């Protein structure tokens, strides 16, 4: 039985609950609901839960450190469970992908994402798997304000279907592996 640490990136607190930057938290909450793995235990500077799904042991983690310090929480969890970056799946928002699309990426840089920057610094490596949920770029205005703003009413309508599609992607990733999942899902419109 393989063990995977699945991390959803976001900011804690009700103020940020429906912001674009909390896409990782939203996916993890949906995964938690569908797998029955509750993410309520306070540990590793975050909220976590453990359970079995599709024959593997999953550790779900929502760092409660705010985005730019997420790496501390993830590093603590990896050390405690004696896991490596190869056992890590990180779900995060991505400005360079349109809303409604998702991409998988193995390794890479942080592309200006403060959560990924923190992870790479704390782990000493960016060689972890990323599930990149598209949020699109603002047509005009500040990127920081955009990622910290709520999804639009139109986006909120499609959000449940998008989150379910990403959970389906995670299920395939766990059962079928990266190459097959990438070929089926990369840049696929999930709405």
From Swiss-Prot:
Catalytic reaction equation(s): an N-acyl-L-alpha-aminoacyl-tRNA + H2O = an N-acyl-L-amino acid + a tRNA + H(+)
GO molecular function, one term: peptidyl-tRNA hydrolase activity
Alphabetized HAMAP family for the sequence: Pept_tRNA_hydro_bact
InterPro entries in the cross-refs: Pept_tRNA_hydro, Pept_tRNA_hydro_CS, Pept_tRNA_hydro_sf
Major localization listed first in the record, in broad terms: cytoplasm
Subunit structure: Monomer.
GO cellular component, one term: cytoplasm
EC number: 3.1.1.29
Stated family: Belongs to the PTH family.
UniProt xrefs under CDD domains: PTH
Keyword Hydrolase attributed: yes
Enzyme active site: 21
Keywords, ordered alphabetically: Cytoplasm, Hydrolase, RNA-binding, tRNA-binding
Annotated function: Hydrolyzes ribosome-free peptidyl-tRNAs (with 1 or more amino acids incorporated), which drop off the ribosome during protein synthesis, or as a result of ribosome stalling.
Protein name in the entry: Peptidyl-tRNA hydrolase
Chain positions of site Stabilizes the basic form of H active site to accept a proton: 93
Annotated positions binding tRNA: 16, 66, 68, 114
Site (Discriminates between blocked and unblocked aminoacyl-tRNA) location in chain: 11
Broad EC category: hydrolase
């Amino acid at each position: 039985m393989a063990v995977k640490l699945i991390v959803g990136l976001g900011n804690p607190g009700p103020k940020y609950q429906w912001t674009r930057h909390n896409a990782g938290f939203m996916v993890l909450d949906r995964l938690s609901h569908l797998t029955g793995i509750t993410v309520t235990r306070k540990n590793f500077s975050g909220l976590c839960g453990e359970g079995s799904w599709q024959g593997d042991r999953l550790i779900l983690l929502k760092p409660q450190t705010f985005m730019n310090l997420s790496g501390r929480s993830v590093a603590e969890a990896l050390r405690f469970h004696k896991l490596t970056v190869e056992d890590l799946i990180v779900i995060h928002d991505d400005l360079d992908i349109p809303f409604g699309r998702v991409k998988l990426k193995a390794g890479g840089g942080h592309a200006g994402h403060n959560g990924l920057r923190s992870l790479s610094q704390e782990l000493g490596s960016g060689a972890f798997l990323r599930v990149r949920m598209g949020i699109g770029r603002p047509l005009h205005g500040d990127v920081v304000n955009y990622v910290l703003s709520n999804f639009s009413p139109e986006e909120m309508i499609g959000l449940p279907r998008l989150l379910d599609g990403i959970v389906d992607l995670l299920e395939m990733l766990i059962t079928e592996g990266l190459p097959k999942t990438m070929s089926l899902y990369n840049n696929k419109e999930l709405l």
